Amino acid sequence: MNQSLLTPFGNPFQRVEQALSALQQGNGVLVVDDEDRENEGDLIFSAEKMTPQQMALMIRECSGIVCLCLTEERIRQLALPMMVEHNTSANQTGFTVTIEAARGVTTGVSAQDRITTIRTAIADGAVASDLNRPGHVFPLRARAGGVLTRRGHTEATIDLMKLAGLKPYGVLCEVQNEDGSMARLPGIVEFANKHNMPVLCIEDLVAYLTENAKAAG
């Protein structure tokens, strides 16, 4: 990864801190993974703070596959089965069946409806019957241990929410270029500057968590 493109956003520690501050304020952040992995950048929001306007931006500017990152505990609480029994995807992305709020939505496609579905899924005391399946929101199961276990956007999302002191659930979607191709780091930086959002890479988060663990130990 050409780290020089990230230099305007600070050093790795500063990039993580800026992302945490943005999430606490209800704003979005951009997370890029390793070049030898997906080599993509995701727009990420806190599930509890995301607004319909932000959802509309995500639908408009990104791939349209809006994913809700959930912990294994929440997946069990909602009794969400995995999308397939045997996952053969290259990066072992943990898709469950898709969901829709059982109440308070129309077709489930609009930005407001997707926010309603997300709020329903992360509500305290939520149960399986609060959701219909299938739907227009794609839950993702994060691996326990976060990015120190799997260096994926799903785990990065959960780790960021925990570090920010928020509910450990987030919403992500892959950023695309205007021509429909996937945005790489230069395009992610351009998007960040356009929308005044911080950028960090998963490597930054791994270093931050590792350093914190050393300090705590």
Curated annotation (Swiss-Prot):
EC number assigned by the record: 4.1.99.12
Annotated metabolic or biological route of this protein: Cofactor biosynthesis; riboflavin biosynthesis; 2-hydroxy-3-oxobutyl phosphate from D-ribulose 5-phosphate: step 1/1
A Gene Ontology cellular-component term: cytosol
Catalytic activity: D-ribulose 5-phosphate = (2S)-2-hydroxy-3-oxobutyl phosphate + formate + H(+)
Keyword vocabulary terms for this entry: Lyase, Magnesium, Manganese, Metal-binding, Riboflavin biosynthesis
InterPro entries linked: DHBP_synth_RibB-like_a/b_dom, DHBP_synthase_RibB
Site positions per UniProt: Essential for catalytic activity: 136, 174
Domain of life: Bacteria
Cofactor(s) essential for the protein: Mg(2+); Mn(2+)
SUPFAM superfamilies: YrdC/RibB
Binding, Mg(2+) 2: 38, 153
Cofactor note (record): Binds 2 divalent metal cations per subunit. Magnesium or manganese.
Alphabetized GO MF terms: 3,4-dihydroxy-2-butanone-4-phosphate synthase activity; magnesium ion binding; manganese ion binding
GO BP annotation list: riboflavin biosynthetic process
Name of the top EC class for this enzyme: lyase
Annotated binding of D-ribulose 5-phosphate, by residue: 37-38, 42, 150-154, 174
Keyword Manganese: yes
UniProt: Mg(2+) 1 binding residues: 38
Protein role: Catalyzes the conversion of D-ribulose 5-phosphate to formate and 3,4-dihydroxy-2-butanone 4-phosphate.
NCBIfam families for this protein: ribB (TIGR00506)
Quaternary structure and interacting proteins, as annotated: Homodimer.
Family, similarity comment: Belongs to the DHBP synthase family.
Protein name: 3,4-dihydroxy-2-butanone 4-phosphate synthase
Species name: Tolumonas auensis (strain DSM 9187 / NBRC 110442 / TA 4)
Lineage of source species: Bacteria, Pseudomonadati, Pseudomonadota, Gammaproteobacteria, Aeromonadales
